[in-house]
Structure formats: C-alpha cells, structure tokens
Amino acid sequence: CERHDHDTLYKLLPKDGSVKLNPITTRLGVLVLAGPNSRKVLQKLTSTDLSNEAFPWLSGQAISVGHTSCHALRVNFVGELGFEFHHPIEQQVALFDLLMEAGREFGIKPYGIKAMSSLSIEKSYRLVPRELSIEYSAYESGLDRFVHPNKGEFLGRDALVAGREKGLNWNFVTMEVHGVSDADSDTRG
C-alpha cells in the first residue's frame, strides 16, 4: 500500500520540481482506541470536545492526548466507536501506556492487526490490500457512498463514470457463515 501510494504520488509531481515528496512513515506512529467506551477513555486525557457534533465520524483534528500532540481521526476499522492517533513515533510507548491506564476502569485490552482485520470483515469494512486494489473500481468495491463524481474533476473520474455506465464486472458483498464455532481468524487465509 505504501509503495503503491508513493509511486502514484511520485508520478503526479510537477516536472518543474516545485513540489517535493517527503515520506514520513518512519517518523510517525499510529495507535487506535476503539470500543463502546473509547470516547470516555479519551475524554479523560484531552480537553477537546469529543461529541458527535464537534468531532463527527470521518473527521480529523489536531488534539493533545496527555502531553502528546496527535492528529486524531474519528475512524477505525473494527466497527465500533473509535479514534486513530497519528503521533511522533518517539511518543508511542508513553501514549500507549497513558491510554491503557485511562482505560483500566473500562476493562481496556490491546488488540493486534489480525484481530482488527477479522473485525473489519465482520463490519464489512474493506481494506487495502485485502479487498481494495487498483484492480477493482470504487463502485465494484462497494464504496459508492464515498464517490461523488458530480463534485468536480479528480484523477480517474471519467474512467470511473464510464465503467459504472457500462456495468460492473464485480460486486463485493459481505457473507455471513452460520454453524461454524471454531474457525481460524486469519483473514489472509
């Protein structure tokens, strides 16, 4: 995913050198706080208004969590209320410890990427590279609600609209399997 994004952005850079691409992946960390009590946990650590009105789903804000400055996103991939924190990597351990301590009264537990991946399938959230790739259009991937071709020009807009008018080759759907009580949760198969 990162390599693809880098290559795509690099190809789009102006040839005159007026814009530079500066990868910051190794300088930033990402932690996710998710679950029905995530707002209560986070509110203990920040003065930012975390209400739905002030911090709606799919929005982002610069906030402080304890002593850590973060770019917080009101999004996650586990199907619960949650927040993503993008922060300086050198603050990651302190931020993790702070979140765990603040969440102790709510029974907070850490979860890993494989658990997140399984939960995202359960919620029908698609991820790169599992379901989303350059091989399937946004419409084929079930991302219709995020695509607004009438809002103006964007890269690939004409091909996307033409593909939809022609008809979709694929349609991603979520299926539920009943009667299986012991299954491997590895979503990569």
Predicted feature residues:
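Conserved, structured C-terminal
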Residues: 1-189
